[in-house]
Amino acid sequence: MRETYRRTLQQRIAKRRGLALNTKPNQSISKAVIEFIRSTVVRPIHMLVTEPIVGFVCLLTSFQFGLLYIFVVASPWTFETTYGFSLGAQGLTFSGFIVGTMFSYAAIIAGDRFLYQRKLHQFEHEHQAPGTATEFPPEHRLYNAMLGSLILPSGLFMFAWTAEYAIYWVVPIVAQAITIFGSIQIYVPVSMYMVDTYGPLYGASAAGASSLSRYTLSAVSLLFTLQMFKSLGTGWATSLLGFCALTMAPIPWVFYRWGPMLRARSKYEREL
């Protein structure tokens, strides 16, 4: 992909034009370490707790990531206890995730090409006057996420109440495909929305906050998944996840409607 980091681009332009590069004075090791910690640890955590966009995007992406790990543990257990699947057959049940993932990325590519890119070209045509610094709203990234917010809880509830011995085992596998389809529809667009919102200067820090929350929840989810499914059963354990997804479903819609207001209040100004 093309380089997008502003400082790197400025350095390349200056070098190409034979201009003097603005270099920072040499720092001591202690100051360099402090600066490194500030930009890679302190800033992401600060953005996580002070920036609503970062906080809610991290909540969404962490749930999607944790959901994947939950199903890695819960799905084999469900098909073993409900349908008596062998170890090899349990592995084949993940074919639903494979199919759902393939269709999901096809939908994301289609959404980018036929919705996002079309809106972008229209915006550029309307704001092509010289000196115009108007920025294309990153909220247009959220079309697929709004769709996924409706599909994900539907897939979870479908899996919850079709994973029964009396119902053919293909049905819950289809429900898994629907679930992962909706999950990826949310995960990819909201991550891109956050990076677009904070730009090349602070986008990496926002992504760092997302990584911190994602992997923390993923690690924690493995500690309670099997106990939760054994205690509540597949129906109510997955329904609990469905209710969580349903509670978070409005987030992409809120971003699309009030995102400009939230961005205007941000402490991390995006550089054009």
Enumerate the predicted regions with their spans:
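A single, central transmembrane helix in multi-pass transporters
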Residues: 56-62, 66
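Short acidic/histidine-centered micro-motifs embedded in hydrophobic/aromatic stretches
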Residues: 51, 61-62, 209
